[in-house]
């Protein structure tokens, strides 16, 4: 894996996102696929990694796994490796610190994610700016719900929102959304102000993707505190108290996604 070119940095500066096709080699891509299959096979475990589910095609199916780095050393080493750190430092303007990690599985029939910006959900600790690294594990196409971005708005700040924290529908309907169709091993970096969404998976195969969010090191290291607060306010199913209402935290911790 190599660092980025000056022309690629200019693309980042103009658009707020940077797509690097084929950036991982075959060995790295194969390792990621294997590790994600391991995560999927892990049982639900209160107090440890978080597994999230959705209702799709009349059944409960895996939607997301997060907070897994303390339990998977190889994954942790990869995501803090020099090559990724070097790219992030160039994009951030300083050293980056890992803030949160997740895998969205979007299995066959899985629902899409509503249009939103990440920034409102990422500023809990007074941080000013985040970058998310997306790694495509499976081919991401229009049919299976690839990521789509609305270009030209990352420098605008927070955009008009609906009551649930997703983007205002009238604003969404006026935008031209660009689908980013990716292959396994492609990387996509995007900042927390880029409007994005994805459609449902209408294929018979998964569209798995790794998402890792980083913040500038000068804004502090809050990964552990973030997941502790999320677990307390919006825990996974296996930790929930029967009859308790967790909806108040949904706009912060369940923004625009199909998790039940």
What do these predicted regions represent?
Residues 118-130, 175-176, 182, 205-206:
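A short beta-loop-beta micro-motif enriched in histidine and acidic residues
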Residues 113-121, 135, 167-174:
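Active-site glycine-rich loop that binds ribose-phosphate moieties when present
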Residues 94, 120-127, 136-146, 153-154:
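Active-site region of the double-stranded beta-helix
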Residues 1-15, 21-115, 121-124:
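Non-heme Fe(II)-dependent double-stranded beta-helix
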Residues 33, 39-42, 46-50, 194, ...:
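Non-heme Fe(II)/2-oxoglutarate
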Residues 94-101, 111-113, 129-135, 145, ...:
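Generic beta-strand structural signal
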Residues 125-142, 181, 189, 213-217:
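Short, conserved beta-strand element in jelly-roll/cupin
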Residues 10, 140-199, 219:
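Double-stranded beta-helix
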């Amino acid at each position: 894996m190599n660092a980025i070119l000056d022309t690629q940095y200019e693309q980042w500066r103009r658009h707020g996102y940077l797509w690097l096709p084929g950036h991982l080699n075959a060995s790295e891509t194969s390792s990621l696929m294997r590790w994600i299959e391991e995560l999927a096979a892990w049982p639900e475990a209160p107090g440890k990694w978080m597994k999230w589910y959705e209702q799709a095609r009349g059944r409960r199916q895996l939607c997301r796994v997060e907070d897994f780095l303390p339990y998977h050393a190889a994954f942790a080493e990869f995501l803090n490796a020099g090559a990724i750190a070097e790219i992030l430092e160039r994009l951030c303007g300083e050293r980056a610190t890992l803030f949160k990690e997740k895998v969205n599985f979007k299995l066959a029939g899985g629902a899409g994610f509503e249009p939103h910006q990440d920034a409102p959900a990422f500023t809990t600790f007074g941080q000013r700016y985040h970058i998310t690294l997306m790694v495509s594990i499976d081919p991401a196409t229009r049919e299976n719900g690839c990521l789509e971005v609305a270009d030209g708005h990352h420098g605008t700040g927070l955009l008009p929102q609906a009551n649930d924290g997703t983007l205002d529908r009238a604003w969404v309907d006026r935008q031209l959304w660009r689908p980013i169709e990716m292959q396994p091993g492609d990387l996509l970096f995007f900042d927390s102000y880029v409007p994005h969404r994805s459609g449902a998976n209408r294929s018979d195969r998964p569209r798995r993707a790794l998402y890792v969010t980083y913040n500038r090191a000068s804004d502090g290291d809050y990964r552990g505190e973030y997941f502790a607060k999320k677990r307390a306010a919006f825990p996974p199913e296996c930790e929930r108290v029967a009859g308790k209402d967790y909806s108040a935290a949904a706009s912060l911790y369940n923004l625009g996604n199909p998790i039940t």
